[in-house]
């Protein structure tokens, strides 16, 4: 049985209910809550629904407002809470749009308008952000928005399970990829992203070796594991580095796997960091390996703003 999040219209309490349930009793205020959109629309005029729809369209910018504050929460231990908070904001904007679509039967038109307006707003944000000497480049700014779309906005739209959720997610991704062909990404879900934090196989070394068609017990991975367990774990600094790596590695892999150029990125990680690290291990130069390892973690943290 799948569960979805809804909010009580009286107290705004967060309710986790089966996706097939049409009504329930609010656990917080005792209100009898109905989720049957069609029923709720019967008592509202077309003018009211249209006005609320237009207002929601004008508020689409709220879907990426504060993205620079939210992105650093995409880590093990903080993603779930930050996503649920973002979900509330997303539902407040998208629910009136869903109701208008249900009333008018114009799902395709609604998806087209939302996509057009949203991408236009994103374009304005990107173009209006001033780049300064030593500050973020335009490419860096686009990368930030791609990251936010990939791990927050698109998963939020899909999580709500609106009648047009999948169509809207596809339209936004397709439109973004047309406008930014060097910054493409694939459709992900909150469930898949959050489960990635619980899997040991999502670490960077494993992901890179898998991209190179190497087995989970290959020579390279065993060498990295031995370095971790026998050298890094022997010092407090090394233990702290391992802990930081475990905090961010699942997020990095989850994001890279949804970027269309992930194979290239993994090859770059191998050639720039992991291969030199492996060669240092083989030569007994463990401090050099630690240096490569530390630099890789710092670079990836900066890339994902975490």
Predicted segment positions?
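Short linker/helix segments within small regulatory modules
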Residues: 17-25
């Amino acid at each position: 049985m799948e569960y979805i999040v809804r909010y009580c219209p009286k107290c705004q309490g967060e309710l986790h209910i089966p996706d097939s349930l049409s009504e329930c009793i609010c656990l917080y205020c005792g209100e009898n809550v109905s989720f049957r959109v069609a029923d709720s629309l019967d008592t509202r005029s077309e003018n009211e629904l249209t006005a609320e729809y237009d207002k929601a369209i004008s508020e689409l910018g709220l879907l990426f407002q504060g993205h620079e504050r939210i992105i650093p929460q995409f880590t093990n231990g903080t993603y779930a809470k930050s996503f649920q908070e973002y979900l509330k904001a997303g539902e407040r904007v998208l629910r009136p749009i869903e109701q208008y679509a249900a009333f008018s039967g114009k799902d395709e038109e609604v998806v087209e308008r939302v996509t057009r307006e949203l991408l236009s707003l994103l374009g304005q944000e990107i173009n209006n952000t001033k780049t300064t000497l030593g500050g973020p480049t335009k490419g860096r700014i686009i990368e930030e928005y791609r990251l936010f779309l990939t791990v927050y906005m698109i998963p939020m739209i899909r999580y709500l399970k609106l009648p047009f959720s999948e169509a809207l997610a596809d339209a936004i991704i397709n439109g973004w990829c047309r406008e930014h062909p060097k910054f493409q990404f694939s459709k992900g879900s909150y469930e898949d992203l959050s489960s990635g934090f619980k899997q040991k196989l999502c670490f960077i070394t494993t992901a890179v070796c898998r991209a190179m068609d190497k087995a989970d017990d290959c020579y390279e991975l065993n060498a990295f594991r031995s370095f971790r367990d026998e050298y890094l774990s022997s010092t407090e600094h090394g233990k702290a580095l391992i802990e930081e790596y475990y905090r961010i590695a699942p997020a990095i892999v989850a994001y890279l796997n949804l970027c269309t150029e992930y194979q290239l990125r993994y090859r770059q990680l191998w050639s720039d960091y992991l291969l030199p690290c492996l060669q240092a291990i083989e030569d007994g130069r463990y401090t050099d390996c630690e240096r490569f390892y530390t630099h890789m973690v710092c670079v990836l943290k900066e890339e994902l703003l975490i």
